[in-house]
Amino acid sequence: METSQKYHTCGSTLVQTIDAPLSLVWSILRRFDNPQAYKQFVKTCNLSSGDGGEGSVREVTVVSGLPAEFSRERLDELDDESHVMMISIIGGDHRLVNYRSKTMAFVAADTEEKTVVVESYVVDVPEGNSEEETTSFADTIVGFNLKSLAKLSERVAHLKL
């Protein structure tokens, strides 16, 4: 019996501690209309529907050198009280098919001046790729974005001191 690749998924969870207060980190992270503020793989972003709130759809152009040119993404949830956002990739010319992520931000346990950001995702494993290859690719992108968010947040936090 042949296993269908259609339902073969993988996922991961990445954690980033940021030396900046939750309110600052969330103010950057929650901007669905401006991911290029910290996601350095994003060249441009335009909302094709909505105002940046739940249900909004954005068209993202990716910087050259990556194995993609664009991505279409939907904001499924944005909770400013719980500091949670969920995004689905609904189109594009890349290998992250049926990518769904949940990002949460919390005050760090040891000090209110730090924030912990947790991003988890699930994505289809493309035909011809392994779970390990797909997870490694997605982890690299998500990890780089979280590190970039940390750098920007920490730079802004230190400017405010």
Curated annotation (Swiss-Prot):
The keyword DNA damage does not apply. Pfam families: Polyketide_cyc2. One of its GO terms (cellular component) is cytoplasm. Abscisate binds at residues 39, 68-73, 95-101, 119. It comes from the Eukaryota. A motif (Latch loop) lies at residues 94-96. It is found in: Cytoplasm; Nucleus; Cell membrane. The record marks 67, 130 as: Involved in interactions with PP2Cs. Keywords: Abscisic acid signaling pathway, Cell membrane, Cytoplasm, Membrane, Nucleus, Protein phosphatase inhibitor, Receptor. One of its GO terms (molecular function) is protein homodimerization activity. The record marks 87 as: Involved in ABA binding. Residues 3-154 are annotated as: START-like. A motif (Gate loop) lies at residues 64-68. Upon interaction with ABA, the 'latch' and 'gate' loops change in conformation leading to a tight dimerization and the creation a surface that enables the receptor to dock into and inhibit the PP2C active site. Homodimer. Binds ABA on one subunit only. Interacts with PP2Cs. Binds to CARs protein in an ABA-independent manner, both at the plasma membrane and in the nucleus. Belongs to the PYR/PYL/RCAR abscisic acid intracellular receptor family. Receptor for abscisic acid (ABA) required for ABA-mediated responses such as stomatal closure and germination inhibition. Inhibits the activity of group-A protein phosphatases type 2C (PP2Cs) when activated by ABA. Suppresses the phosphatase activity of TOPP1 in a dose-dependent manner in vitro. This is Abscisic acid receptor PYL11.
